[in-house]
Every structure is written in C-alpha cells, then in structure tokens.
C-alpha cells in the first residue's frame, strides 16, 4: 500500500510503500521514517494510571557518588602505576582494555545519571560533580553531554534535535560490512563530533568550568606523572567506545537489529516486532553487564521514567512487568556488536526517525535544559 508522511510544518513529503505486517524485513537503504509519537510518553501514562505507586521510585540516589569517586580513584591509581610503561606494550593495553575501558564506560554512564540530576537534589550540584567525574575521560565532555542528552529524551528520533541518530551520510557510506566495522571501532568519535554538526547548543559557564578544570588537571597530571599517565586515560576512553563488551549498549539501545531483538517468549512472523505492539525503537538488556554500567540496559524503563535512578529501575520493571516483558529485548551486548557488523540486514540505516521539529541549524535555547 502506498503511503506518505508529511510534517505539518514542513514542505517535504516522504513517500513509501507499506509492507504487509507479516512480511520479512529487508535490508534498508533509508531510515525507518514514522509520523507517530515516540512510545515512552504513552507507556508512562498507562503505567502511572495502573500503578501510581511508581512515582515513589523517582528521585536521586545519594550513594552513587561514592561509587563514582571509587571509579575515579581506581583510574588515577592505574594511571600512576603505568606512568613509566610504554603505551603500546601488552601490559599497558591489557590494563587499558580490561580495567580502563570498563571503568571509563562506567564514568560515561555515571555522567549520564548526573545529566538527569539523579545524584544530588540541586541540578548545579549534579553538573559540578559531573565535572569531577569527567577526570578519567581525559578530555572535557560532561557539560556538553547533558544538554544534548536532554534533547535525545525530549525529541527521540527527531532528525535535527536527537543527535544520537546517525546522519544520512553515515547511513550511505557506513552500511557495508567494512563501514560498520569502522563505525563500531571509532563510534566514540561519531558520538562526540556528530552533535556539533547537527544542532548547536549554548556555551554556558558550566562548559567553561568543565574545560578549564579538565585542562588544568591534565596539565598537573602530565607535569607530575608524565604523558603516559594521561595516555592511559585517553586510550581507556577510546577503547570504552570501541569494540568493547560494554560499548554494545550504544548500538543495542535504539538500533532495530532484526536477528537479535526478539520478544521474550516468542518470535512472531520472522520479525522482531509483535503484531500487538507498535514498532520498537528502544530496547532493554537485562544481563550481567548492567552491574558495571548503572543498569543502563534497562533502557525502555529509563526512557519511560528518566527520573528514576539506576538502583530502582529493576523494581519498576517488576511492578510493571506486563508492560515490559512482551517488548523485544537485547540478549547480549557482545552479540549486538557482532550481529550489527556481520549481518547484512543490520545497517546504520536501522534507526527510527522523525521529521525535525526545528529547522536545521536552529540554535536551541531552553529546549535542552533539564
């Protein structure tokens, strides 16, 4: 059946042929365009209507700060230990991959918790603690992540405001097997650089504090311990966003990977989507790697209730099990990386996308504030 999608504020119309519900999924050469609203607001309303006690799960988690401080101290200790070790030695690279990348992935996701104000009551305290947590990353990152991530939540799938989405150029040039391998190896750079080319945010005093503090700390570290210590931070950061088990969450959260994401109890019609459910664009993972990543695998739960801290997301799933158990789930982050790269049906195009609410290049004012 022929169909069209046109946003009411846009002159552009997308034409496509709607496949039968039971047809097999084919390799894409464009994104999954939709004119429907993202599903999380609707599901949140339904859950709150049936289980109003869920509101008691919201709020900050004070003990998280102690874990974050422990990870920062761990990274500082290893950086000091490796201060005289050659960067390209097996000892250096093994520690950077096994411990450093895992720790820095935890730091990425601690900053993610802080971006939702889930460690302290006051937003400013969360922002400043994120600057401290940023230390092992080696480059200033936390202040920019927060506003872009707020846009990702508020405008999921928006072609201009959700900078988590790959661009058309990425889809066009990186959807082959070598291209996907390149994307998976260097995805940290795509996530770091892509937002600046899509949507500009306001540079605030928090950004300045983040940049100045990180540069001063790096300078002191190099002066006292040498370049290899800082190199440990940088290499750990790169590996944390490369071919690392914990990095699988970057792809697993929102890519429609047809061979891996299946309903918990059955696979219907050879697709990853139950006929009773709307097309899925967010996926949860309930495996053991959640213990190292602040339960970021509970991603449907997180998008439904972004103000519930990581320690209480499993309880949300337990209370509202009938809303979450039937949804397609990711079974393995390592498997996601493998299936994404080597399965032809999974490409960079495999994301749900919506026509933008703002014109390209529009400077965001208050939309990105938490």
Swiss-Prot record:
Short name of any one Pfam family annotated for the protein: FA_desaturase
Localization per Swiss-Prot or TrEMBL: Membrane
The protein's Enzyme Commission number: 1.14.19.17
Short motif (Histidine box-1): ranges: 112-116
Main localization (coarse): membrane
Transmembrane stretches, start-end: 68-88, 92-112, 128-148, 173-193, 197-217, 220-240
Motif (Histidine box-3): 299-303
Biological process terms in GO annotation: ceramide biosynthetic process; sphingolipid metabolic process
Its job: Delta(4)-fatty-acid desaturase which introduces a double bond at the 4-position in the long-chain base (LCB) of ceramides. Required for the formation of the monounsaturated sphingoid base (E)-sphing-4-enine during glucosylceramide (GluCer) biosynthesis.
Protein name: Sphingolipid delta(4)-desaturase
Organism per entry: Candida albicans (strain SC5314 / ATCC MYA-2876) (Yeast)
């Amino acid at each position: 059946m022929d169909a069209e999608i046109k946003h009411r504020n846009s002159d552009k119309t997308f034409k496509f042929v709607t496949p039968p519900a039971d047809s097999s999924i084919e390799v894409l050469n464009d994104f999954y365009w939709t004119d429907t609203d993202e599903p999380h607001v609707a599901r949140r309303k339904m859950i709150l209507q049936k289980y109003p006690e869920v509101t008691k799960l919201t709020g900050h988690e004070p003990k998280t700060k102690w874990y974050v401080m422990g990870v920062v101290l761990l990274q500082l200790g290893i950086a000091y230990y490796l201060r005289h070790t050659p960067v390209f030695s097996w000892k250096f690279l093994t520690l950077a991959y096994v411990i450093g990348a895992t720790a820095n992935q935890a730091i990425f996701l601690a900053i993610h918790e802080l971006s939702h104000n889930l460690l302290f009551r006051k937003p400013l305290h969360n922002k400043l603690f994120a600057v401290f947590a940023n230390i092992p990353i080696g480059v200033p990152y936390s202040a920019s992540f927060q506003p872009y991530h707020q846009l990702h939540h508020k405008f999921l799938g928006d072609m201009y405001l959700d900078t988590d989405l790959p661009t058309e150029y990425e889809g066009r040039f990186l959807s082959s097997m070598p291209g996907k391998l390149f994307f998976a190896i260097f995805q940290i750079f795509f996530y770091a650089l892509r937002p600046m080319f899509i949507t500009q945010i306001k540079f605030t005093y928090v950004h300045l504090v983040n940049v100045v503090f990180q540069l001063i700390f790096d300078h002191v570290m190099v002066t006292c311990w040498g370049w290899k210590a800082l190199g440990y931070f940088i290499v750990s950061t790169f590996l944390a966003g490369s071919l690392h088990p914990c990095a699988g969450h970057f792809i697993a959260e929102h890519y429609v990977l047809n061979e891996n994401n299946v309903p918990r109890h059955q696979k219907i019609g050879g697709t990853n989507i139950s006929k009773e459910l709307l097309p899925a664009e967010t996926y949860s993972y309930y495996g053991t790697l959640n213990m190292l990543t602040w339960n970021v695998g509970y991603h449907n739960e997180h998008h439904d209730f972004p103000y519930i801290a990581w320690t209480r997301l499993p309880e949300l799933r337990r209370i509202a099990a009938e809303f979450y158990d039937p949804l397609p789930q990711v079974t393995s982050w390592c498997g996601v990386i493998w299936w994404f790269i080597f399965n032809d049906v999974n490409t960079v195009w495999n994301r749900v996308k919506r026509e933008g609410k703002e014109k390209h290049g529009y400077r965001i004012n208050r939309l990105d504030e938490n």
